[in-house]
Amino acid sequence: MVDIVFDIGRVLVALQPERLLGLLRAHGGVARTLEDVTSRIDLTGHETGRVDGMQLLQQIAALAPEPISMTALQEAWVDMLRPEATMLQLADRLSRRHRIFLLTNVGDLHWAYLEQVVGLHHYAMDVLRSDVAGVMKP
């Protein structure tokens, strides 16, 4: 039996931040790319468990001069994760003959969303999340 390790972001899940960026712009923010946002918040702190989801959302909200509903912001933040159906099907097929493990740099909000929408733990024997481990994968 072979062990197979999948990264979650940009492998099993695509990143599509348009809704988040649009929400920020609608409230006076100037972010044009996801990198514009992540370079101005403590994403590493969030993805290593030192900054919880609500604190991260407050940091993102501060990027726009006009107030943003935390509910709308959270929905836009998690909505950027889009499951890649073909890759999830591949992981499912491989899991029938191999041991599958998942690695991810993720925070609590994204993980809760992925578990609800995709049920990623069903694809793997184990998952190593950066926010639980306290360190980021390379």
Task: Go through each PLM region and give its residues.
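Substrate-recognition "cap/lid" segment bordering the active-site pocket of phosphatases
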Residues: 108-138
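Generic structural signal for small/hydrophobic residues in well-ordered secondary structure
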Residues: 7-10, 49, 94, 102, ...
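Hydrophobic alpha-helical core bundles mediating ligand binding, dimerization, or RNAP-core interactions
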Residues: 20-21, 56-61, 73-77, 110-114
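A structural micro-motif
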Residues: 2, 98, 122-125
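Active-site neighborhood of HAD-like aspartate-dependent phosphohydrolases
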Residues: 1-39, 62-63
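Cofactor-binding loop segments of dinucleotide-utilizing enzymes, especially the Rossmann-like FAD-
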Residues: 105
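Short, acidic loop-to-helix structural element flanking the phosphoryl-transfer center
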Residues: 71-101
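A metal-dependent, Asp-based hydrolase signature
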Residues: 43-74
